[in-house]
């Protein structure tokens, strides 16, 4: 079941929040799959959530929904993983910003170069690069409620309702 809240931030950008609850990793992947089906390229997804919250799990579902398959792994040590497929017009670039502490560190990941691409950028530990994220990025916060349960909040900007009623 989803709950929806509308509010305006200090910059005047209307934000929409869509809240979902998942009860297993499979549910989280299924939610990600539905998110992936609604992406068209050029989006930046900014994840928030602690270790083991499910950021890579939901990214696996997003990749499936985009038609890129489920071979998604955490980019913790590589910092960035690219998922491309010859017959898929959109690619997925998956970042882990856990160890990024400066603009110089961020520059070495190629983040800004990828933003010029029509790819979807999925950014774990996005709070480490808040000031460099586009204002219209899609924010996904994953709250771990138990070993299996997650509360997942999707925040969009300027009336973007693509993620309303997922799974209903």
Question: Over which residues does each language-model region extend?
Answer:
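Hydrophobic anchor at the beta1->P-loop junction of P-loop NTPases
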Residues: 45-47
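Conserved lysine of the Walker
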Residues: 55
């Amino acid at each position: 079941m989803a709950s929806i809240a509308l509010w305006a931030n200090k910059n005047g950008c209307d934000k929409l929040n869509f809240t979902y609850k998942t009860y297993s990793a499979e549910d989280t992947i299924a939610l990600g799959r539905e998110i992936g089906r609604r992406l068209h390229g050029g989006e930046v997804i900014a994840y928030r959530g602690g270790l083991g919250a499910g950021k890579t799990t939901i990214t696996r579902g997003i990749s499936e929904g985009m038609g890129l398959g489920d071979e998604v792994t955490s980019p913790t040590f590589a910092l960035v993983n690219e998922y491309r497929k010859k017959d898929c017009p959109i690619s997925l670039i998956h970042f882990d910003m856990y160890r990024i502490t400066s603009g110089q560190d961020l520059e070495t990941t190629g983040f800004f170069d990828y933003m010029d691409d029509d790819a979807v950028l999925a950014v774990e530990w996005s709070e480490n690069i808040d000031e460099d994220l586009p204002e219209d990025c899609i924010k996904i916060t994953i709250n771990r409620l138990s070993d299996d349960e997650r509360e997942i909040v999707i925040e969009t900007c300027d009336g973007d309702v693509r993620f309303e009623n997922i799974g209903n």
